Structure formats: C-alpha cells, structure tokens
Amino acid sequence: MTVRNLEYLFRPASVAMVAEPDEPSRYAEVVLSNLAAGGFSGPVMSVSARKRPLIHVGHDVRLGEFEVAPDLAIIAASLDLVPSIIAQLGARGTRAVIVGPWMWHRMSASAIDKARKAIREAAKPNLVRVLGPGSGGLVVPAIGLNASATPVPITPGKIALVAQSTALTAAILDRANSKGIGFSTVLHLGSDLDVDLADVLDWLAADPDTHSILVQFDEVSAGRKFMSAARAAARNKPVITIQPGPVSGRHEGSGPFSTADVYDAALRRAGWVSINTLGDLFEAIEAMARIRPLRGERLTILANGHGLGRIAGDTLLRSGGELGSL
C-alpha cells in the first residue's frame, strides 16, 4: 500500500487514546503523559477513566464519545478487541492507528493469527493504516508528537530512526539524549501487519525534515518491495543500518534474506552503509547529526601525501564527481 494515508500517521492533526482497564492501561497513561509533555498542539481526545483521561473499553466497545474523528488513534487493548475498535474508528473517519503492546501470554498462536487476519479485514474498508501490533510507538518531535512510552526526552533533529528492537531503540535514544542529538522521526515497527519497513522508507525518503536515516531490522516480509524502497531512500539521503546477523530460525537457504552475507550484499547494492557494532553505531549517529548538505558539484581534496590525494581524486572522477581548486 506504500505511503497512502501515512500522512495521518506521521502528521496527524488530532490524536485519540483507546485503552482497556488492564495492564496495557499503564502504557496508555505513559503515552498520554508523553503527548502532553511533547507539546502536541492538536486535540487529544478521550473520556475519563481512572485518574487520567482514557477511553475505557470492555468487550462491548463503543467509541461514540469522540466529538470528531481523530486522525491517529493509539490502541492499548487486548488483540481480540482491536478489530472492533479499528472498524469503528475507520467508520468515523480515522485513517491511522498504532496498535501497542498487548498480553501475548494470554493468547494461543492460532488466536493471535486469527486476530491479525481480523485486524486486516477491519482496516481494509476505510483504508486505515496500522502500525503494529506490538509497536512501541512513533515520535515526530517537530510537531510535538510523542505517541510512545519512551522515558527519554527527544528533541527535533534531522535523523530518522526506524527499528524493530525496543531495547536497541532505548539505547540509541539514551545515547543521543546525552550527546544532544535530535531526531526528525523515531518509529518502532512492531510486527509489520500493514505499515512495514518499505512503507516507512518511502515516506522518509520524501520527508524534507529528514536528512539521514538510521535503520535496525531483523528481517523483512516482502523482499522485492523492501529493496525498491531501500534503493529509493539511498538515492535521496544517507541510510545506515546496523548489520543483522544469523539468528536461530534463520538458516541458509530459508529465503532471499537468510544470512548476514546476503543482507550485506543486498544493502550495499542498494547504497546503504552497514555497520556491525554498537560502538560504530553510536559514532555513526554522531556523524549523521553533524553532516551538512553539500553545495555545488565540485569537491576539493586536501591530503598529506601525493599518493593518497591522487587515489582520492581518481575515485571521485570515476564516480562522476568534479575536482575543485583552491
């Protein structure tokens, strides 16, 4: 589906929280607190439950309390309730939802699969875009949108961070905060039932607030779609990824992206830069935060040796560049 209706996810004019009175409600309370702290200027719609404004839903879900349809809804509810919530939101005009964490241990594998299919069917009639289930949320600091449970303040910047690992996302945000590095977008994918990495890359490639993209992922579900988006993103701005390695369950020959070598070759061909360690990752983040767009077509090379300068100049010319002079 690519970027259709993603403007309601990344640039919503209004937000709503939908939660049930259970463990996920704590997540909902933190997200609402972050929305308030981030300074989101649009309405955050809700009704009263507990001590914080939450939509209090049970198995008989009714969302008629909304005065207007929210562009974006954040859902913190059991997976079996999510299809009904999405159907009602979609009928009212909502076009994007974030489905947050839920209690995996309470559902069998078959029940989870059934719920995922039901979510797809509920979203389809009104073209509702679904981030998740299991997404840690989305942050767009420039518009004050912090629809996540992250405890770390995130300032505006020019780097987009897209990740599948919540732990690594937290580590990156903590390090960036200590260095005064900001982000244009921070997004945790969760399980890519609808909005996947390729969709997000297509959006970020055209986003004027994003100058570089940092990606962490374990696997992709649609290889051809992903590679098309990966190439398009790298044509527009630098893309860096922390190299995924072989993990349990991903064996040689199990698919087009079954080993670290295949990942690396595919990403290098797309124009991405792969790094292998957390140390390199943090150095890359600092470099990305400080790079500036090049102006003009020429490049002047300064070297402390004739041989090194000549190698650099030859590489530049072979790549279609033009040498400048002082």
Regions found by a protein language model. Give the residues of each.
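Catalytic-core regions of core metabolic enzymes
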Residues: 1-326
